[in-house]
Amino acid sequence: RDTLWEDDVVILVIDTFNDERSGYEFHVNPLGAQGDIRMTDTDGWSSDTSWNAIWDSAGQINDKGYVVEMRIPFKALRFPENKNELTWGFSVMRNYQRDVLYQLSNMGFDRNVKCSLCQFDKLVGFSDIESSKNIQLTPTLTTLRNDNKSALPGDWDKGDIDTEVGLDLRWGLTKDAVLNATINPDFSQVETDSLELDVNTTFSIYYAEKRPFFLDGASYFKSSLFELLYTRTIAEPTLGAKLTGKTGDHSYALMLADDDNSNILLPTNQGSGFASLNEKTNAAAGRYQYDLGQQGTIGISSTHRESDDYHNTVLSVDGTYWFNQSDTLLYQVSSADTRNSEFLIQNYNLSETQSDEAYALELTRDKRDYKLFASYENIGQDYRTDLGYQAKVDYEKVGFGGGQTWYRDESDLLTSWSYEADWDKTWAQNGDLLEEEHEGFLSFKGQKQSIFEIGLVHRYENYNGNFYNQNIGFIY
């Protein structure tokens, strides 16, 4: 199952709101192993593999090939409420892994068109779908006892037994709105983090969320360019509630939670690390998004975290704009206001108050044979998103890049080759140069799905006032 994406696999993609902006992917291989993905298409295809649904799949290999079956309950999906007849975008595909990767589909894709969902066939019907309350209750009981041995040899000294009772609630209020709640959540059965090497890293490592309460409906909180809600900063919640949904062109999300072990990311332009507040905090996050035109979006997000003598509040506006079927603009403006606690002031040398802004733009063109991009970021020195992930602040950055691909016949030894190159330059807010980077690589694809890549990176970097030249080459 871990290599399902590299297998011969049948894929069903459904755009249940027919908004041509997001959808659900369901993958099944010949042995019936399954995978599911929540995808978005507001700026090209983007996949979120952390999404999980409960559904059934089966597969059988026969003399002519193989057959797969999928049984997806409606409660695993979200779709419009109060409509007599629904229209869903859909595509059925097969990744046919042979000497060359073929993708077979019920419809053809124009690779000069950046969006994929807008090219899907439409399925009309579902007039008899009844909205169920769809209540899921998951009680938990956790017991813990620590025994100690004071002398060797000797007997164990039995410790006290600590018992905690918890409850998770998932309530489908309607077909397009879900309420989640949790009391003393038990995350002991959640899969562990992937091993990350944190040696010689100046900026904090990003870890993916794995906890079910935070994963359900997580896509409703996502903004265009900044990660304003990084739920891994909420380490030990005892109470939490969340409402997510979509009605017509309007999507909304609201989350409230407390935290007994609050972690805060403290960034600079030279590095970042987490600070523990050692006190209980309350957290809130909300987002509203409106689907603008055929493909675009505009949204407003806010997060707030507070304790007795501390608060951090962030307000942001963002969106995507499609000039045509291949050219898009992403933008985001954000403002943060912080009052630091005495603990943070004394232990991390912070001022009593911090307030600043952040801006970002990204312009891209995606065509079949080439792509271009330009980006700009301006992050203030005192900009902090204590519920989000902003590992670097106090900088201004510009970047340009692009690439081109040449396609050859599928029977040739070399089926395609491409190049990509980019340049970016970063300054501190006081004007000092932080980094200038040039990067380029060549990629060759051939038979047996073989890939050969060669690349070079030149980086001129300022670290604590000292400049370093880095020249990196790689072959893959």
Explain the meaning of each model-derived region.
Residues 1-284, 289, 309:
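Structural preference for beta-rich elements and adjacent junctions enriched in aromatics
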Residues 30, 74, 94-96, 143-147, ...:
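Transmembrane beta-strands of outer-membrane beta-barrel pores
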Residues 39-41, 103-105, 149-154, 193-196, ...:
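Outer-membrane beta-barrel translocator domains and adjoining extracellular loop/strand segments
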Residues 68, 137, 167, 241, ...:
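Membrane-embedded beta-strands of outer-membrane beta-barrel proteins
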Residues 72, 171, 245-247, 289-292, ...:
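Residue-level signature of outer-membrane beta-barrel architecture
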Residues 135, 177-179, 249-254, 294-299, ...:
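Repeated loop/turn-to-beta-strand initiation elements of outer-membrane beta-barrel proteins
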Residues 236, 335-476:
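Exposed, low-structure sequence patches enriched in small/polar residues
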